[in-house]
A protein has these predicted regions:
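Aromatic- and Gly/Pro-enriched helix-to-coil junctions and flexible linker segments
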Residues: 2, 29-102, 107
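Positively charged, low-complexity intrinsically disordered regions
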Residues: 5-9, 28, 171
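Short, flexible coil/linker elements and helix-boundary hinge sites characteristic
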Residues: 12-16, 26, 66, 90-91, ...
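Surface-exposed polar/charged interaction patches
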Residues: 13, 17, 62, 66, ...
């Protein structure tokens, strides 16, 4: 083995060790965190916003009782999960540039509605369903020729969690 190869091998081992240490120490901080810190981190990641004290206490209690999944479902009840997290999750699928910075549209609204209603996610591919804004919001009518309905819904600031209604797509 030449000197250059030995140096390269030692550098690779050193880099690998450094990456491993960084990963392990990052995980260790989560393990060392108490239930409230874990609950806050889960809520921040899932909903993208800090939880209220009541929600934080509820989630911490779930975590302390070994029910971290229940804590995550609690975080999913925050409107920001639907308005931001799910919108950004589905948005890249709706445009060629795969950008999450696009206006709300029928596909994104339908993904959000199906998740909110606990439906089989595969239905987004085959079911005759479409989610539109609640009629009480006085939005422009749904149209297949423009996106005015969904852009107005998003601009209204209305919660997507509370204001999407399931419709039969072929009836619109």
């Amino acid at each position: 083995m030449t000197a250059r190869n030995r140096i390269r091998s030692l550098l690779c081992k050193a880099c690998s060790t450094a990456v491993l240490v960084a990963l392990v120490s990052g995980q260790a901080s989560l393990v060392q965190a108490g239930p409230r810190e874990q609950a806050k981190r889960i809520h921040d990641r899932v909903a993208g916003v800090p939880p209220s004290e009541v929600v934080l206490d509820d989630m911490a209690s779930d975590i302390e009782s070994g029910r971290a999944i229940d804590a995550a479902f609690t975080a999913m009840q925050d409107s920001a999960f639907y308005d931001v997290t799910l919108k950004n999750f589905a948005a890249p699928w709706t445009n060629e540039a795969m950008s999450k910075f696009v206006p709300l549209n029928d596909y994104i609204a339908t993904v959000i509605g199906l998740v909110r209603d606990g439906e089989d996610f595969r239905k987004v591919l085959y079911d005759d369903v479409l989610y539109i804004g609640n009629a009480s919001l006085n939005l422009p009518n749904y149209s297949t020729s423009n996106n005015n309905h969904y852009e107005s819904l998003e601009n209204s600031g209305a919660s997507l969690k509370d204001n999407l209604e399931r419709e039969i797509q072929r009836s619109l």
